[in-house]
Design a protein with these regions (language model features):
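A charged helix-plus-loop insertion that forms the helical arch/lid used to bind
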Residues: 131-142, 186-188
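Active-site mouth loops of central-metabolism enzymes
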Residues: 61-69, 136-146, 230-242
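Second-shell residues forming the walls of enzyme active-site clefts
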Residues: 50, 87, 97-106, 110-112, ...
């Protein structure tokens, strides 16, 4: 069932190949994707897929936006051999990402998710794109409507280059000055303010037609270890977690936002395994 839902979202969101500077309607407009015809088409696609193809749809492959034959071969293999469900481009040139997006979509039998890690817009990864302040600065804005409009503008720019999912916003509460990886990526150290900014920005993204992904659940703000390199441990009781780390994520869930990224974090109070591989932490927290 979960695979069916994921593929349904993928097929409905990525309904066409998008090219630079195209003006497209919002891809997540309410009532547009949830139709009987669309569901029937998704069911038909699923019925024709092998188990390998269904598994491949659950993976997003990271590629560099480089116009090299080796890179194109990498993309070709990911799509044709492994049947991946989407791509995540790393840092590089805007024009290269657009060209490779169109190339990749032309290869895919099932339209691809094109994802992006743009916490403060395209300039976080792509050269020569509009620059916005980091989240720490945006967290000082008192009018949350501005965060909403900011999210819509980021969504507009994402759609112009064919991106349907942005791995943003950061929902971590930065309460540890020795944190080596979050700091200015966070909206600040006040859980309520962080939650308000997260919801406003993410709603702007989604109303603009781009799926938001709040991160890094259950909270990476009070760590002294970078989870890309090692396993941070959060030895806090449930009351502390509920009041700080988990608070913005719970508000995002209440707001009905579309996505959440699980961090590689060990939180003994929530489960014996790291959150990234703990169904209990993900499902029951």
């Amino acid at each position: 069932m979960k695979r069916n839902v994921l593929l349904f979202i993928s097929l409905c969101v990525v309904g066409c190949v998008m090219t630079y500077a195209q003006q497209m309607p919002g891809l997540l407009q309410k009532g547009k994707a949830d139709t009987q015809d669309c569901k029937a088409w998704v069911d038909e696609q699923l019925s024709e897929m092998s188990l390998k193809e269904k598994i491949g749809q659950l993976f997003i492959h990271t590629v560099a936006p480089l116009q090299t034959q080796r890179n194109k071969n990498n993309i070709y293999a990911a799509i044709k051999e492994y049947k991946v469900g989407g791509l995540l481009f790393s840092s590089g040139q805007l024009s290269n990402q657009v060209l490779l997006t169109n190339y990749a979509q032309s290869l895919a039998e099932v339209p691809l998710f094109i994802t992006f890690d743009g916490e403060w817009g395209l300039a976080m990864r792509l050269k020569g794109t509009p620059r916005f302040p980091r989240n720490r600065v945006l967290g000082c804005i008192q009018d949350n409507e501005l965060l909403y409009e900011y999210g819509k503008e980021v969504a507009r720019q994402c759609k112009e280059i064919g991106v349907q999912i942005n791995f943003a916003p950061v929902a971590d509460v930065d309460v540890n000055p020795r944190n080596p990886v979050i700091n200015t990526r966070s909206f600040g150290g006040d859980p309520r303010n962080v939650a308000q900014k997260v919801v406003a920005y993410a709603r702007g993204l989604e109303d603009g037609g781009v799926l938001s992904v709040c991160k890094h659940f259950p909270g990476h703000g009070d760590t002294e270890v970078d989870s890309h390199k090692a396993l941070p441990v959060l030895n806090f009781d449930r009351a502390r977690l509920d009041s700080i780390e988990l608070f913005p994520f719970k508000e995002a869930v209440k707001a009905g936002l579309g996505g959440m990224m699980v961090g590689h974090l060990e939180v003994p109070e929530l489960g014996k395994n790291p959150a990234s591989i703990s169904s209990h932490t993900v499902s029951y927290t």
